[in-house]
A protein has these predicted regions:
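Extracytosolic ligand-binding ectodomains
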Residues: 1-9, 20, 25-369
């Protein structure tokens, strides 16, 4: 059993009171997990904000099947072992459904526990194909996949920047290497070869040696597979060293913390992300509610909201919170109305439509191109 063989340490776990005290029989426990602490905590906050607002809105309308939702927040710090601990804690607490995790390197090992313990999981952010390709009954996403995102990036580089000298940099994480390799695959298939493929160490503060190698190689376009903190530092240090290049990256750059790190050097950096859900008519009322609270529902906030929303819709239609029956309903039913618009699932648990587009950083904000 995974609960006996995998690491089960003390993981930071906060229980969020989503409803006034009520008998346990009148409650349904759900969870959301992500990096609430550590270098990716800004993304954990996005997941927490989305889940909390969804629970509040659902409870205000009577809950699910007449029962109020109680939300637990788990902190995995984007660490695989801690993610397993969080998953086991959710199982011990009787959680039926989890909106999470953020990092693919957390979602994938946690999913093994959820599969064994009979918990349905919908990630709003983990894009590595392996998460759903392994064929578990309980794994779903509201986001797209690296191969979908990499196809857009690879095709763009090969067709619109075919004369550039390209470097692909990646941080050797499940997410970063995954998206870099998918981009490389599609770029190569379109006839464009990279001049450099290089791994870098995440968590460092000095990337000047890496920048020097880029300059020496005459690189004038860099594609990053990794997270916003390191990418922001590399872009900033590249500007300080006088490297003139175009910078492209993945969906990890859709956080204002990127600009806080890069400063003006982030001007013109481009990244792939689905069409901004904040602008969708289906999200207007929820976006307005977030703004009243002083929250900008950027990045994965609405994707997490939608994860809770689509689970609640399927449970209501199935007339049960039994995870296997809800999972079957998600795949056979739909389309499901959410803040992201209508969502439908294929047999793997992937959304049938994930339209990635380009965004660009300008003057401290990112905009769809």
């Amino acid at each position: 059993m995974l609960r006996r063989t995998l690491f089960v340490g003390a993981a930071a776990m906060a229980s969020v009171l989503a409803v006034a005290a009520a008998p346990a029989s009148a409650q349904i426990k759900i969870g959301s997990a992500g990096p609430m602490t550590g270098e990716y905590a800004s993304f954990g906050k996005q997941l927490q904000d989305g889940a909390q607002q969804a629970v509040a809105d659902i409870n205000a309308k009577g809950g699910v099947l007449g029962k109020k939702l109680v939300l637990e927040i788990g902190d995995d710090a984007c660490d695989p072992k801690q993610a397993v601990s969080v998953a086991n804690k959710f199982a011990d607490d009787g959680v039926k459904f989890v909106a999470g995790h953020f990092c693919s390197s957390s979602s994938i090992p946690a999913s093994k526990v959820y599969t064994e313990e009979g918990i349905l999981q919908i990630t709003p952010a983990s894009t590595n194909p392996k998460f759903t390709d392994e064929g578990a009954w309980n794994t779903f996403r509201t986001c797209g996949r690296d191969d979908q995102q990499g196809e857009v990036a690879g095709h763009t580089i090969a067709t619109e920047y075919k004369d550039r000298k390209v470097a692909i940099l990646q941080d050797n994480t499940t997410y970063g290497k995954g998206i870099a390799d998918e981009t490389k695959k599609f770029m190569n298939a379109a006839g464009k070869k990279e001049a450099m493929y290089q791994a870098y160490v995440p968590g460092e503060s000095d990337y000047t040696a890496l920048v020097s190698r880029l300059k020496e190689a005459g690189i004038n376009l860099v594609y990053f597979g990794g997270y916003h903190k390191e990418i922001g530092q590399i872009v900033k240090q590249a500007a300080q060293q006088g490297l003139k290049a175009t910078y492209l990256g993945p969906d990890s750059l859709v956080t204002k913390e990127f600009w806080q790190i890069s400063g003006p050097a982030g001007e013109g950096v481009m990244m792939t992300f689905p069409a901004d859900p904040r602008n969708l008519p289906s999200a207007k009322a929820v976006v307005d509610e977030f703004k009243k609270k002083g929250i900008d529902p950027e990045g994965y906030v609405l994707y997490t909201y939608a994860a809770v929303q689509v689970w609640a819709e399927a449970a209501t239609k199935a007339n049960t919170t039994d995870p296997k029956k809800v999972a079957a309903e998600l795949k056979s039913g739909g389309p499901w109305p959410t803040v992201l618009g209508n969502i439908s699932y294929n047999k793997k648990g992937d959304v049938t439509k994930a339209n990635y587009v380009w965004y660009i950083w300008h003057d401290g904000n990112y905009h769809q191109m």
